[in-house]
Amino acid sequence: MTTNLQEMGKQAKQAAFVLAQLSQQQKNQALEIIAQQLEAQSDKILAENQKDIALAKQNGLSDAIIDRLLLTPSRLNDIANDVHHVISLADPVGQLIDGGILDSGLKIERVRVPLGVIGTIYEARPNVTIDVASLCLKTGNAVILRGGKETQYSNKILVDVVQHALVQAGLPKYAIQAITDPDRHLVMELLKLDRYVDMIIPRGGASLHELCKQHSTIPVIVGGIGVCHLFIEQSADLDKALPLIENAKTQRPSTCNTLETLLVQRAIATQFLPKLAQHLSAKHVKFHADPTALAILQSVQADVEPVQAHQLRQEWLSYDLNVVIVDDIEQAIAHIREYGSQHSDGILTGSQRLAQQFVAQVDSAAVYVNASTRFTDGGQFGLGAEVAVSTQKLHARGPMGLEALTTYKWVCVGDYCVRS
């Protein structure tokens, strides 16, 4: 373990002790300064981001990755607004969860407290730097950030802005730190830093999550892989379904809550798929279809090719869409269980009974009825900027907002009580 990373961990732990004692007013003041500095330093931030974009293009990175990497004035404004929204949220730290008084007279309360130090490993998403920093600060947690090399210029300027704001607010600079060295071995070292780090949150592709699961000695939040499905059932309103599917697939295809596989009930396939192909033609969606859907889509000259088995488990993060024909809801649910990632899956239907069946039997973090999967987001759910979307079941599930960055302690107060 390098001395540098050990020192970062030690500094983060010391900062976490300070943050845990702060009032909501003190934390909100620091967050307000961060939001102000994001706006004041926007030109510098965007200029540094363009360096990352230029390198990404030079290195031949995909359009999906470049879209994730890109900051625009609008996106930077959205990030600052997310910080303001976090300010407006109630501080969960110190909340009384439950409690009572024992026969012995001992008063017991379960109180919400910060986790301590969070380690976040992420790829080409500079917005994560501010999302994580603001949520951790609001909940009294310190954080060590390790962004991908693709975001080195963006992350450095963003962390500089945050640390400057912390100092202005009279808080420890080391509450928010970033590993700027692109050496991949430092990721492995961070995963072993259990003396100081209390939780690891990876945000990236399947390989990153698998790496963290296999090598971390620190609890890991698993999630973010979005092989999301929509099942359109024969009683659905087909005209209303078209713009919904367009939204789920094309609004921002590089996100983890984007639709990747459309399941179409056989009874409406011949009627619906030509309409879908026409509706999505302007968006240049490329279909990957099973034999039945392939024949229908080819008959209307859609951009389509046969779907390969491995593509049914693929997070496209692009304008590609799998189309699979199923006989009924049972086949749709079976397909989702086999190929889904337990992220976000939905049904389009006019049947309350089938909607209830789908909700009960699909085991995903977010299950939708007649709505786009694009809603799986901390801001959309009213949680503020999210730190991640968890697809596991322990500790947190779905978009992780403020409460997901806390744990609890038992506070026991007596009058010199002894156990009999």
From Swiss-Prot:
What is the protein name for this chain? Gamma-glutamyl phosphate reductase
Where is this protein primarily located?
A: cytoplasm
Molecular function in Gene Ontology: glutamate-5-semialdehyde dehydrogenase activity; NADP binding
Give the catalytic activity: L-glutamate 5-semialdehyde + phosphate + NADP(+) = L-glutamyl 5-phosphate + NADPH + H(+)
Gene of origin?
Answer: proA
Gene3D superfamilies documented for this protein: Aldehyde Dehydrogenase, Chain A, domain 1, Aldehyde Dehydrogenase, Chain A, domain 2
Name which cysteines form disulfide bonds.
none
Q: What is its biological role?
A: Catalyzes the NADPH-dependent reduction of L-glutamate 5-phosphate into L-glutamate 5-semialdehyde and phosphate. The product spontaneously undergoes cyclization to form 1-pyrroline-5-carboxylate.
